[in-house]
C-alpha cells in the first residue's frame, strides 16, 4: 500500500528530476506576484547549545487558505497585506509578530532584500545571505553560504513550489550578557503557491545536523482521514550530494505532552513528547532511525502551529548518532 501511495504522490508532485540536479543559484525568490499569492522564506538552524537549542526565521507573505498554514480570522487587516513572522528559539518563545506589508515592511520585488520592522532583515546577494534578528530576549546575526545541495519538497507546476538548500553558516547568538559564535549547517528555504484552500490537516518537518558535513530532513503532510500527501527523508552534504528516500518510511508518536497548547485562534493542539521515525535505503536496509524526546520549547508562529527542538539518539548509515534536532509541528485534525 505504501508503494502505491508513494507512486500516486509522485505523479502529482513532480520533484523526482529536480532532486537529481544541483541548486541553481539564480533561482527566483520573488515576493508575491501574479498567481503566486503566498510566498514563504525560511532559515532554520538546529543543534545549537543552550540556551538557544535552535533558531528559525519563518516568513509567510499573504494569509494562506490552507488550514495548517494560515488563519484568516487572525489577520489584523487585509489578509493579502499580512506578513506573518516568527523568529523562534528556546529563549524567544514569543517571537511571533504580524505586519502590514504595505506599511511596516521593506521588500524588493525579487526577494533579495526583506525587512520586517526592527525584528528581522534578510539580504541575499551573489556572495551569500545575511540575517539580522532582534527580540527583547535575544539577537542573532548570521551569514549563510549556500551549497549546491538542494531538496525539492514540492513541484506542482503552476500551483506550488517548495525547496530547501543546504547552507554553511557562521553567526553570533546573544541572550542577555551571554554570546556564542557558531559555525554550523542550516537551511535556506523558499516556497510559492497559488492561494488555494488545500485540505492539509497535519504537518511536521524536522532537521538534523548528523555531523559537520551532513544534514537530514524529514517531512510528513497529511490530508483528511490521514491520507498522506507527502512523506520522506532527504539527505544532503556540503559536497553537493542530495538524495531522497521514502522506502520503509515510518513515523510514530509514542507519547504526547500532558498539556495541549492553545493557539491564538483557540485551537487546542496535541504536541509530541516521545516519538520516532525511520526510513530505509534503496536496498531496503536501515538508513536512519531516530528516537526523539521534545525539549518542551515550542514557539508559536510556524503557520498555525509551532517550532521547537528535541533531543535525539539513533543510527545513521550503521553508526550511532545523537544531538538536538529541529521540529515543526502543526496538527489541525
Placement of each model-derived feature along the sequence:
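Structured soluble/peripheral alpha/beta segments that form catalytic or ligand/cofactor-binding pockets
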Residues: 1-333
Amino acid at each position: 500500500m505504501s508503494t502505491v501511495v508513494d507512486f500516486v504522490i509522485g505523479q502529482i508532485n513532480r520533484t523526482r528530476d529536480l532532486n537529481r540536479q544541483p541548486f541553481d543559484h539564480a533561482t527566483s525568490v520573488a515576493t508575491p506576484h501574479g498567481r503566486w499569492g503566498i510566498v514563504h522564506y525560511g532559515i532554520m538552524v538546529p543543534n545549537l547549545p543552550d540556551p538557544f537549542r535552535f533558531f528559525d526565521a519563518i516568513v509567510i507573505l499573504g494569509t494562506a487558505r490552507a488550514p495548517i498554514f494560515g488563519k484568516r480570522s487572525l489577520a489584523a487587516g487585509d489578509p493579502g497585506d499580512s506578513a506573518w513572522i516568527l523568529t523562534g528559539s528556546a529563549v524567544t518563545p514569543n517571537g511571533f509578530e504580524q505586519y502590514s506589508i504595505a506599511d511596516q515592511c521593506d521588500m524588493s520585488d525579487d526577494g533579495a532584500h526583506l525587512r520586517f520592522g526592527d525584528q528581522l532583515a534578510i539580504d541575499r546577494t551573489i556572495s551569500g545571505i545575511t540575517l539580522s534578528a532582534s527580540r527583547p530576549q535575544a539577537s542573532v546575526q548570521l551569514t549563510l553560504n549556500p551549497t549546491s545541495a538542494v531538496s525539492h519538497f514540492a513541484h506542482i507546476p503552476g500551483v506550488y513550489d517548495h525547496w530547501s538548500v543546504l547552507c554553511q553558516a557562521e553567526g553570533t547568538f546573544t541572550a542577555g550578557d551571554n554570546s556564542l559564535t557558531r559555525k554550523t549547517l542550516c537551511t535556506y528555504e523558499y516556497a510559492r503557491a497559488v492561494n488555494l484552500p488545500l485540505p492539509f490537516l497535519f504537518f511536521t518537518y524536522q532537521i538534523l545536523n548528523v555531523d559537520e558535513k551532513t544534514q537530514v530532513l524529514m517531512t510528513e503532510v497529511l490530508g483528511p482521514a490521514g491520507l498522506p500527501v507527502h512523506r520522506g527523508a532527504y539527505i544532503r552534504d556540503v559536497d553537493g550530494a542530495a538524495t531522497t528516500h521514502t522506502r520503509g518510511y515510518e513515523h510514530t508518536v509514542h507519547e504526547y505532552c500532558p498539556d495541549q497548547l492553545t493557539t491564538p485562534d483557540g485551537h487546542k493542539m496535541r504536541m509530541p513528547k516521545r516519538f520516532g521515525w525511520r526510513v530505509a535505503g534503496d536496498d531496503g536496509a536501515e538508513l536512519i532511525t531516530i528516537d526523539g524526546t521534545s525539549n518542551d520549547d515550542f514557539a508559536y508562529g510556524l503557520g498555525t502551529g509551532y517550532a521547537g527542538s528535541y533531543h535525539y539518539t539513533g543510527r545513521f548509515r550503521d553508526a550511532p548518532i545523537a544531538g538536538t534536532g529541529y521540529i515543526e509541528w502543526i496538527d489541525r485534525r
